[in-house]
């Protein structure tokens, strides 16, 4: 089930690790993983917990957002680290459930933490999707050369 692809990538996400902050080229693994494995490895209880929020989002929040048509579309100008209520997170997840192809979404994992894609992961969990694409960033700067 695990298919690996190796590539070099520059990332702009803040606070992932020193390699990213220094914009150092890193080997990146892209895997298809069972969502239940991701949840266990990343120690997620039910749904991811965001740092800047009022409380943990629950399935009822997502269900209510879908039922009431409260959908929050992606916005590139929105700071991903800014404060959002649990209802705002649920509206973002609801938008993904309604409009995104969840079979094709990708999340980014570094040091057993989802560093990009918590809303996508939440949408997949709620929709009972079995497999998700994961970009797995290494925790070390050592690069292995792999012949193609």
Predicted regions and their residues:
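An acidic, glycine-rich, mixed-charge low-complexity segment common to nucleic-acid enzymes
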Residues: 5-67, 79, 83
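Short glycine-/polar-rich loops that comprise or flank the Walker A/P-loop
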Residues: 130
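Short, Lys/Arg-rich amphipathic alpha-helical interaction segments
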Residues: 133-148
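Ordered hydrophobic segments in well-structured contexts
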Residues: 106-108, 122, 133-135
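A sequence-level detector for short glycine-anchored, His/Arg-bearing signature motifs
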Residues: 109-127
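Short alpha-helix boundary/capping and kink motifs at helix termini
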Residues: 61-113
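Short intrinsically disordered terminal tails
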Residues: 1, 26, 146-148
């Amino acid at each position: 089930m695990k298919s690996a692809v190796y590539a070099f990538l520059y990332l702009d996400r803040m606070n992932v690790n020193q390699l990213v902050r220094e914009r150092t080229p890193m080997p990146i693994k892209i895997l298809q993983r069972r969502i239940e494995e991701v949840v266990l490895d990343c120690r997620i209880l039910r749904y991811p917990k965001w740092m800047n929020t009022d409380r943990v989002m629950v399935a009822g929040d997502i269900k209510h957002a879908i039922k009431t048509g409260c959908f929050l579309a992606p916005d590139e100008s929105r700071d991903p680290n800014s404060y959002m209520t649990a209802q705002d997170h649920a509206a973002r997840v609801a938008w993904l459930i309604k409009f995104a192809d969840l079979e094709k979404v990708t999340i980014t994992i570094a040091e057993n933490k989802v560093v990009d894609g918590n809303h996508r992961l939440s949408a997949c969990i709620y929709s009972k999707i079995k497999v998700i694409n994961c970009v797995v960033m290494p925790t070390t700067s050592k690069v292995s050369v792999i012949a193609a």
